[in-house]
Amino acid sequence: MLEVNILDKKWCSIIENPKNFVLGVINASLKELKIDHYKPNISIALADDDLLHQLNLKFREMDKPTNVLSFPYEQLSNECDLGDIAISIDTIKRESHEYYIPILAHIAHMLVHGLLHLLGYDHQKKDEEIIMKNLEREILASLGYNMCAI
């Protein structure tokens, strides 16, 4: 089951129906990765910089907000609790403006990025980063978005 929690009303001023948008991106990503049959449980928090700052400080010891954080729980299996994704509308808006990225494309990118982290992908090493970026590019292309470089 996919659960979307809108924790900041700014999301509704950017996207007409944020829950449907998020569900569409996540479901299409799972399908593109050919793992949609597992039906994992994922919770997505559509939040703001305040929450992402708190989470980033608590879990990563980084005293600043960030665009997306992922909290994996279980490895992928049938109806597993895959984990949580939190995404900040404030950082997304700022980055979209700063890097001239369409905001919906950037939101989709960060959702895909967060999902890949839940699935165990990382970008700490160059070879891992290449694999993760290629997957992001493929998934975003399947959604009709070009990969935006940040």
Curated annotation (Swiss-Prot):
The Swiss-Prot or TrEMBL record lists the needed cofactor(s) as: Zn(2+)
Q: How is the cofactor bound?
A: Binds 1 zinc ion.
Enzyme class at the top of the EC tree:
hydrolase
Q: Which PANTHER family match?
A: ENDORIBONUCLEASE YBEY, CHLOROPLASTIC (PTHR46986:SF1)
Under which name does UniProt file this protein?
A: Endoribonuclease YbeY
Annotated keywords: Cytoplasm, Endonuclease, Hydrolase, Metal-binding, Nuclease, Ribosome biogenesis, rRNA processing, Zinc
GO MF annotations in UniProt: metalloendopeptidase activity; RNA endonuclease activity; zinc ion binding
Q: Which domain of life is it from?
A: Bacteria
- The gene name reads ybeY
| Matching PROSITE patterns | UPF0054
> Where does this protein come from, organism-wise?
Wolbachia sp. subsp. Drosophila simulans (strain wRi)
- State the family named in the UniProt similarity comment for this chain: Belongs to the endoribonuclease YbeY family.
